[in-house]
Regions:
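Unchanged
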Residues: 1-195, 306
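Left-handed beta-helix
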Residues: 140, 149-318
Length: 318
């Protein structure tokens, strides 16, 4: 329920995506499960099929929320319409250390057709064709195949169905060459955030000609006291900085007291770091309070995660 509220909060009226007119609107199916499984119940496909049938669209794009990309889908649609397959899949060439065992890697021939796929199991190659699980599919064909899947005793999630369809239909493979972060773990999430401190990666993701729409907060600028010391960090608005901050991503309405130190960390909104407290290699969720003199310290390969709303009164060191 919390995730659904967050989605509504960010979409708002849908105006930025052309979804607030008389002739267009958005449909949001309410399906949520705490259980991680490759199979689903009948409600899962009832929601998807209702959306597809109401859409009246010729083509459908399915997106995966585990990859961070800023992709121009118009280019993908153009190639899909030019090559005329029933399925087009987007892939990225990635080094093996950035791929996890839940990712699908593709076998692609010289004409950019998908010949096969398998879950990543490691190997000797340095670079693999990792599927982003972004697909463009002809809608009538997709409805037909999903109705077949929904009728099975144990229907699979959409991504698994689409992976197999890409092979069965010799899908066209579109290579994405821009910035991509494959967020498959806490460490990968941590790295993706701190990547934004590198200007080259930042401008690859937030390209000036390809806007990223999100919720806007009009607040006062962040205040930096004379006692503050800031190096290579990004701040949102509304914060008060009296301490030391370096190599960190800082959200809105954060309060760093004098004598506090934050480095190599991701700080969510409304966090308070008291006098003399130290935070290193940590992900600190919304509304956390770190008491005076307390140390929260993870490592580069194992950052500490502090739960939303926690009050930290004792050291947490890894």
């Amino acid at each position: 329920n919390e995730n659904i509220s967050s989605v509504f909060d960010h979409i708002r009226s849908g105006r930025e995506w052309g979804l607030s007119t008389l002739l267009s609107h958005y449909y949001l199916g309410i399906y949520n499960t705490p259980v991680e499984s490759s199979t689903v119940d009948e409600e899962y496909y009832r929601q998807i099929l209702t959306y597809l049938k109401r859409s009246g669209s010729d083509q459908t794009v399915a997106l995966n929320s585990d990859v961070l990309v800023n992709i121009d889908l118009n280019q993908v649609f153009h190639l899909h319409n030019t090559t005329k397959p029933k399925v087009t899949v987007v892939y990225k060439k990635l080094p093996k250390e950035l791929i996890s065992d839940v990712n699908s890697v593709l076998e692609i021939d010289d004409s950019d057709k998908v010949l096969g796929h398998e879950l990543f199991q490691g190997g000797d190659k340095e670079v693999y064709n990792m599927s982003t699980d972004i697909f463009v599919v002809d809608t009538p064909f997709l409805i037909e195949k999903l109705e077949e899947e929904a009728a099975k005793e144990e229907p699979r999630k959409l991504r698994y169905v689409l992976r197999d369809l890409a092979v069965a239909e010799n899908a066209f493979a579109y290579e994405y060459t821009g910035y991509l972060s494959n967020i498959h773990s806490v460490k990968a999430y941590f790295d993706a955030n701190l990547d934004m401190l590198e200007s080259q990666k930042f401008y690859k993701l937030f390209a000036p000609n390809q806007k990223v729409y999100t919720k806007v907060k009009n607040e006062e600028p962040t205040y930096y006291a004379d006692s503050s010391e800031v190096k290579l960090s990004q701040f949102a608005s509304g914060s008060i900085v009296r301490g030391k901050v370096e190599n960190s991503m800082i959200s809105r309405n954060v309060d760093f007291s004098e004598g506090s130190s934050v480095s190599h960390s991701i700080i969510f909104p409304r966090v308070k770091v008291a006098k003399g407290a130290t935070v290193e290699y940590a992900i600190v969720d919304k509304g956390v309070e770190i008491a005076e003199g307390v140390t929260v310290r993870g490592t580069e390969n194992n950052p500490v995660v502090i739960k939303k709303g926690s009050v930290v009164t004792e050291d947490i060191v890894r």
